[in-house]
């Protein structure tokens, strides 16, 4: 599933995810992954564009960024649990996109969610705790970003 299912009216992708969650799933656990990041992100994602100087615009949107290593830990926990139904996988913390990078054009993005923030109650009940955070990741990659975009941060 996806965190987009919370606002199915925004776009067809979100509507599809919402409908899939409404189907009966009596013996399944499925994850709503929030914005996953790593040093090798998908090329169409914000973090890739940020690390490679390809940011065309920023929005006022907020995202719950979760590192891929933490996603793996969440999957391992869920594999060994008896939980069923949808589970949010994220940090439970939203970060404003326009606070990450400055000096690029601003754009309103009405077809995107304004804010994503995982409800981590279920994962925390299993002992889940994120070890990575977006701020440290960005600071660790500061020199790369600074070379590509002198206006970042």
Residue ranges and their predicted role:
Residues 50, 54, 80-120:
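Mid/C-terminal beta-alpha module of Rossmann-like enzyme folds, strongest
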Residues 36-40, 56-65, 87-95, 109-113, ...:
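Glycine-rich Rossmann NAD(P)(H)-binding loop
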Residues 71-75, 89, 97-100, 123, ...:
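Non-catalytic, hydrophobic alpha-helical segments
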Residues 1-15, 36-43:
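Conserved catalytic-site region of short-chain dehydrogenase/reductase
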Residues 11, 41, 45, 63-69, ...:
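Residue-level signal for the nucleotide or nucleotide-sugar donor/cofactor binding architecture
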Residues 22-63, 68, 72:
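NAD(P)-dependent short-chain dehydrogenase/reductase
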Residues 9-29:
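Active-site Tyr-X1-5-Lys
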């Amino acid at each position: 599933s996806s965190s987009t299912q919370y606002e199915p009216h925004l776009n067809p992708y979100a509507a599809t995810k919402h409908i899939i969650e409404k189907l009966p799933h009596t013996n399944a656990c499925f994850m709503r992954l929030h914005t996953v990041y790593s040093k090798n992100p998908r090329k169409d994602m914000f973090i890739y564009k940020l690390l490679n100087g390809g940011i065309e615009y920023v929005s006022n949107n907020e995202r719950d960024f979760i590192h891929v290593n933490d996603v793996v830990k969440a999957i391992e926990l869920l594999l060994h649990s008896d939980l069923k139904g949808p589970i949010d996988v994220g940090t439970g913390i939203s970060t404003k996109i326009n606070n990450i990078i400055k000096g690029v054009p601003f754009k309103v993005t009405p077809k995107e969610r304004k804010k994503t923030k995982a409800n981590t109650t279920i994962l925390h009940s299993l002992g889940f705790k994120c070890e990575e955070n977006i701020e440290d990741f960005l600071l660790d990659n500061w020199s790369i970003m600074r070379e590509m975009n002198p206006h970042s941060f």
